[in-house]
Amino acid sequence: MPFCFPSSLRPCPAVLALVALVGCTAFESQVEEFPDAGPNGPDSTYAGIGQGIPFGEFGLTTEQFGAPYTGAIVQVSRSSVASVLRAGQGRRLRLVLNLAGGGKHYVNPDGTFNLGLWKARIDTYRDVDFSPYVTEGLVLAHFLMDEPGAARRWGGRPPTRAEIEEMARYSKSIWPALPTAIRTTAEWLGRGDTTYANLDIAWAQWAGPHHGAGTGLTPERFRDENVARAKELELGLIFGMNYLDGGDGSSGIPGTELHPEWWQMSAAEVAHVGTVLAAAPYACALLSWRHHAPFESRPEIRAALDSVVRVAAVRGGTSCTRRGTVPAP
């Protein structure tokens, strides 16, 4: 039987009066666009709920949901989130949802981070109850922000670690059961004296041995150092690879337009690094930057990615939340 409002909505008396006059018809389409979460709790057909961990990428469209991918990082809007949830549920992909969108939406005129604007973007989803989708396994986490430590992205003044924890607290005040993730390493998060009571997940992306968090490291040391630091902070850990700028030069193929002096990863690098990261027992997902059809359509790259997919699929699932209790809002 259709109903007018999701259980998370508390309509005001004026709205109730309007419904009494015109009935539910005008509201049904908005309500019915959201899929029903599985009625029996966690669904073991999702990677990480049963066997394996999610394997996926930034930049996938809903039309690309499905094998070989079992996870995706998706930038959504209030008008698109329902259709993304439907698509993910239909293809059994676990979704990390970027609710606020790109950084351009929450910066000051000088390019510095504006926490108030970020919160305003999050407020547009207050009528959406994500908790059933978290329980089912469809929604893996709320992606708070990309690369907070990259000063160039934030007008020369990166968001503070205290601001990141406040972002996580604000998310939890609306959706206590929704895990919070930030795409930066636990090592960066651990600098300073911020305590993370609401942030759940750190994110370590291999960008090669010449720059980024992997500078001077082997993939094995990168894995071990990030796992150790995440454990110290009691954070879950997502790993990823930078396919297009994370090579050591052995591919001979220049990186993206932003970094033509860097290198794409070779097939051998993808297979080796991906296997090292996907097999790490502490890692709860392998979600990489980014989907690029010309890169992935090369036979040797496709074969390398498929070998990593198999590793991610057969290992035991791992939770992304590492604390014993969910912090109070």
Predicted regions mapped to residue ranges:
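N-terminal Sec signal peptide cleavage junction
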Residues: 24-27
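Generic detector of N-terminal low-structure segments
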Residues: 5-7, 29, 36
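Bacterial N-terminal signal peptides that target proteins for export
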Residues: 1-14
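Glycan-processing catalytic domains of CAZymes
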Residues: 33-329
